[in-house]
Amino acid sequence: MCDFTEDQTAEFKEAFQLFDRTGDGKILYSQCGDVMRALGQNPTNAEVLKVLGNPKSDEMNVKVLDFEHFLPMLQTVAKNKDQGTYEDYVEGLRVFDKEGNGTVMGAEIRHVLVTLGEKMTEEEVEMLVAGHEDSNGCINYEELLRMVLNG
């Protein structure tokens, strides 16, 4: 199981309490996915239903759970988080390959990394792409991905 630190658990509990509308330390089943997403996870609705034990749709706004029952569900979702494959990342970057030659503009990849998804700082991006740009300012994204994914 993916164990959380004491600080993480405290942060998760604080976020959980923000969704507790009645102040009884519980949230509705229907809020479970929202809380997980607020905590940086991205479970599908099917994954949320699975960790909740596949409740009927009419139970979603009736059944409640407390933090002690929510935390193991969050751990399950975090542990099963799809990290994506090399091919997934290549496909994602191929969208930016306007010439179809396996390269993307360095400026464009920088922009994507600092503005979309799990945003990186400009310093992190510079460290990542350092030495990968050719004389035209292009980056071979397959080569970059191999370097990133292989450490």
UniProtKB/Swiss-Prot annotation:
Residues 7-42, 84-119, 119-151 form the EF-hand domain. The modification N6-acetyllysine is found at K81. Keywords: Acetylation, Motor protein, Muscle protein, Myosin, Phosphoprotein, Repeat. The modification Phosphoserine is found at S57. GO terms for molecular function: calcium ion binding; cytoskeletal motor activity; microfilament motor activity; structural constituent of muscle. Transmembrane segments: none annotated. One of its GO terms (biological process) is skeletal muscle tissue development. GO terms for cellular component: brush border; myosin complex; unconventional myosin complex. Gene3D superfamilies: EF-hand. Myosin is a hexamer of 2 heavy chains and 4 light chains. Interacts with SPATA6. This is Myosin light polypeptide 6. It comes from Rattus norvegicus (Rat).
